[in-house]
């Protein structure tokens, strides 16, 4: 316990007494009984009883349980005597034993036995027990006059009943003194057990660092046993060092001014007196509250310790705190060996002279920068100086020592010279390297991060502009795609189109104003003549074979509602396109798609493939009801080419009659044809050309049909122009102004003839009018486009 008892104390204890509880704090506790009866130390008799009630008796309610606590008395030389107290239930009285030996468990058990005897009014038996203990010789391995462990001595006491001696019927008690060479263990050592239970590991480390720095430490608790146990256990953690300053485990109320002392101290204050202590001017005081488990310190004592030592304490203290054995004591002993184990290298041994300690040699050691900085402070500590003096005293007296501390130094040096030392060096180098690496990373990344932060706005604007341009590009592509799909209007039916049926029907409607509806202009379909002559029609749109009818792109279906919807087909534009194409390439002919659509629309719930037919078909119109004389006419062109050109056709049948619109053939390439200077403003009474019906024979759809060669007649062009002129636009015979139902009623389809069967076509009338030859086809088309 750090006491400096007399070399050979005369007895196991000096004084035993029982003090009564005073009525107020100003009164001294009365002594009810004592042993030995002739004890004459007046100073002790006046001062010691007041330590038996270290709490506010006026405010603190009496405890229903028995409490054990300890106080210490230090003389001018530094010798200490310990008072072991047992406070009875209800705090009516207190039993106390004053001794130089810090044997906590032994004296606590003695007090319990004496208390039980006194409670049974066996005063004689209690006095006999105390007399036997006082007269018992102290010589022996377990009863030494001075403890080598000092404050960290472990008391392993056993109380048993011995068999009665011969001729004596009384039972004797047996107490076993502690082993001076052992370390405190859990749960045998009550003080250490109370400390690890009441205080957390981190606060234990902070308390240990504050004691090594010799701070003013103040502990508070509402339980006396816990308060004194924490004070004594914290001192025991300093082994082999010894607390050389003021030590008061329980401060009585009349000594509260000691808390304001300027020197280092370790004082325990009961919870009932803590408020009065805090009212005093306390400066630079470390306060540990065991009840709330909090540590208040104005210093960084833990950071002053070497980092590897602190890491060792925090890591291993959690594992050994509540485990039985010497784990906690062994851990703190190892820490002390790491901190002060180098003192042996600073001992100077000169033959014939006493052994001395060289402070310069101790500081000249290079165990590491943190430990070297700690050594510079440690050489000025009173506990380190007292430790060195005690070691030198034994060496110069010729007494060897081989305690637990020296054994731990040897163990640590063996480890530090090998793996532990290399590990410490590696940790130091790693920390230095990591610091340099972090510094270099910061210096390199900070400019980049700053530039990235600054360019954040510009990057956002750049991304926004890119997104806008991408959206505009997609819109342009969609617009171009829509335009391309619109340009397919009026083209070959074999052109693959992904548009829906309604879109295709909408594209085939004429671009003109009908019934108050406005439609956009039809896109231009001019052919580039400067690039060269057009390719032959038979190469561009070959004849469909029966197997091609299965191709989904080779057929185009139309709803029956298309013909009955009231809309009209743009026959005039397609006729003009045919005239324009034939004007540039007179040897080629193609079928009109609108006429094909009319033929396809006549079919009920059937889909037919309409190929581009390279030759003209024998379309004939019914005779007009108002005109009884038919005007037959033929399609001009290269007859030899028409005879050599094969073709195929899909015929659609309706319920009542099948109508086939006629196909016009423009004049040959060499003959530009007559032109009109202006449109004919005549009313619709002008006759319109009609095709005569020719009787034919039915043949399979697969059989080709050949046209009979006819002579070209210039009247055909005239009559075609008269059809396209506005003079016929309002006539009933004009198919452009007639609904699809009327067209179907007026038209009749001619079935295909068998292979080799002749077909007769009547000649067209050769009547011509001079005023119809003035405008040209190109001018007429340009007029319609405008």
From Swiss-Prot:
Positions with biased composition (Basic and acidic residues): 527-541, 770-786
Domain of life (superkingdom): Eukaryota
Annotated source species: Mus musculus (Mouse)
The UniProt record lists the keyword Transcription regulation: no
Broad class of where this protein is predominantly found: cytoplasm
Motif placement: Clathrin box: 570-579
Biased composition (Low complexity): 657-675
Renumbered ranges of motif FXDXF motif: 401-405
Signal peptide residues on this chain, from the entry's feature table: none
Classification lineage: Eukaryota, Metazoa, Chordata, Craniata, Vertebrata
Residue span, dDENN domain: 320-398
Residue span, uDENN domain: 13-158
Phosphoserine carried by residues: 565
Complexes and interactors: Exhibits low nucleotide-independent RAB35-binding activity. Interacts with clathrin heavy chain/CLTC and with AP2A2, but not with AP2B1.
A single cellular component GO annotation: centrosome
Protein name: DENN domain-containing protein 1C
PANTHER family: DENN DOMAIN-CONTAINING (PTHR13196), DENN DOMAIN-CONTAINING PROTEIN 1C (PTHR13196:SF25)
Recorded GO MF terms: guanyl-nucleotide exchange factor activity
Subcellular location: Cytoplasm, Cytosol; Cytoplasmic vesicle, Clathrin-coated vesicle
InterPro entries, per database record: cDENN_dom (IPR001194), dDENN_dom (IPR005112), DENN_C (IPR043153), DENND1A/B/C (IPR040032), Tripartite_DENN (IPR037516), uDENN_dom (IPR005113)
Originating gene: Dennd1c
Residue ranges, annotated region (Disordered): 481-553, 653-741, 762-786
Polar residues composition bias: residue spans: 542-552, 706-740
């Amino acid at each position: 316990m750090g006491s400096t008892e007399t070399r050979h104390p005369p007895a196991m204890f000096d004084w035993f007494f029982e003090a009564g509880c005073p009525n107020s704090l100003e009164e001294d506790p009365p002594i009810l009984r004592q042993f030995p009866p002739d004890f004459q130390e007046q100073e002790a008799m006046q001062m010691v009883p007041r330590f038996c009630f270290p709490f506010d008796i006026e405010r603190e309610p009496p405890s229903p349980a028995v409490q054990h606590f300890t106080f210490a008395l230090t003389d001018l030389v530094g010798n200490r005597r310990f008072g072991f107290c047992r406070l009875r239930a209800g705090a009516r009285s207190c039993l106390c034993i004053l001794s130089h030996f810090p044997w906590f468990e032994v004296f606590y058990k003695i007090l319990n036995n004496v208390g039980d005897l006194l409670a049974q009014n066996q005063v004689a038996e209690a006095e006999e027990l105390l007399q036997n203990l006082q007269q018992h010789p102290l010589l022996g391995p377990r009863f030494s006059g001075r403890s080598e462990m000092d404050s960290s001595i472990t008391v392993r006491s056993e109380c048993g009943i011995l068999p009665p001696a011969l001729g004596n019927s009384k039972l004797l008690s047996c107490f076993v003194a502690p082993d001076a060479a052992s370390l405190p263990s859990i749960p045998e050592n009550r003080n250490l057990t109370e400390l690890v239970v009441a205080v957390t590991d981190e606060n234990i480390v902070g308390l240990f660092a504050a004691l090594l720095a010799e701070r003013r430490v103040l502990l508070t608790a509402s339980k006396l046993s816990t308060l004194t146990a924490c004070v004594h256990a914290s001192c025991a953690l300093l082994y082999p060092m010894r607390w050389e300053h003021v030590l008061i485990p329980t401060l009585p109320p009349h000594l509260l001014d000691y808390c304001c002392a300027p020197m280092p101290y370790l004082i325990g204050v009961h919870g009932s007196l803590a408020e009065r202590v805090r009212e005093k001017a306390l400066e630079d005081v470390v306060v540990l509250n065991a009840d709330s488990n909090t540590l208040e310190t104005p210093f960084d004592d833990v950071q002053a310790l070497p980092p590897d030592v602190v890491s060792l304490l925090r890591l291993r203290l959690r594992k050994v705190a509540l485990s039985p054995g010497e784990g906690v004591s062994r851990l703190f002993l190892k820490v002390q060996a790491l901190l002060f184990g180098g003192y042996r290298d600073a001992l100077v041994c000169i033959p014939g002279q006493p052994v001395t300690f060289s402070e310069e040699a101790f500081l000249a050691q290079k165990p590491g920068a943190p430990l070297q900085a700690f050594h510079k402070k440690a050489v000025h500590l009173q506990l380190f100086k007292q430790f060195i003096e005690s070691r030198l005293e034994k060496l110069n007296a010729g007494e060897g020592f081989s305690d637990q501390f020296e054994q731990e130094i040897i163990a640590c040096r063996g480890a530090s010279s090998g793996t532990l030392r290399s590990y410490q060096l590696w940790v130091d180098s790693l920390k230095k390297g990591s610091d340099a690496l972090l510094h270099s990373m910061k210096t390199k990344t900070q400019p980049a991060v700053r530039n990235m932060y600054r360019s954040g706005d510009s990057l956002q604007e750049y991304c926004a502009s890119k997104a806008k341009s991408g959206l505009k590009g997609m819109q342009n592509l969609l617009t171009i795609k829509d335009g391309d799909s619109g340009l397919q209007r009026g083209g070959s039916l074999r052109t693959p189109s992904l548009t829906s049926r309604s879109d295709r029907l909408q594209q085939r409607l004429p671009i003109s104003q009908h019934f108050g509806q406005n439609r956009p202009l039809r896109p231009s379909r001019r052919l580039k003549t400067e690039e060269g002559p057009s390719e032959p029609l038979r190469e561009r749109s070959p004849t469909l074979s029966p197997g091609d009818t299965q191709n989904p792109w080779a057929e185009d279906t139309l709803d029956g509602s298309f013909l009955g919807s009231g809309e009209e087909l743009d026959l005039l534009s397609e006729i003009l396109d045919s005239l324009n194409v034939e004007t540039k390439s007179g040897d080629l002919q193609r079928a009109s798609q609108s006429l094909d659509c009319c033929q396809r629309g006549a079919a009920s719930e059937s889909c037919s493939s309409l190929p581009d037919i390279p030759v003209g078909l024998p379309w004939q119109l019914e005779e007009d009801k108002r005109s009884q004389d038919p005007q037959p006419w033929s399609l001009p062109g290269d007859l030899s080419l028409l005879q050599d050109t094969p073709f195929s056709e899909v015929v659609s049948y309706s319920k009542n009659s099948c109508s086939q619109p006629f196909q016009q053939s423009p004049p040959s390439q060499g003959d530009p044809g007559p032109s009109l200077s202006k449109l004919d403003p005549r009313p619709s009474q002008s006759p319109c050309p009609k095709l005569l019906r020719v009787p034919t024979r039915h043949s399979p759809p697969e059989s080709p049909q050949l046209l009979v060669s006819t002579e070209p007649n210039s009247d055909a062009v005239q009559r075609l122009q008269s059809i396209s002129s506005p003079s016929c636009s309002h006539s009933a015979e004009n198919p452009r102004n007639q609904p699809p139902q009327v067209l179907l009623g007026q038209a009749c389809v001619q079935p295909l003839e068998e292979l080799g069967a002749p077909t007769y076509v009547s000649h067209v009338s050769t009547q011509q009018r001079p005023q119809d030859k003035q405008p040209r086809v190109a001018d007429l088309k340009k007029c319609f486009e405008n």
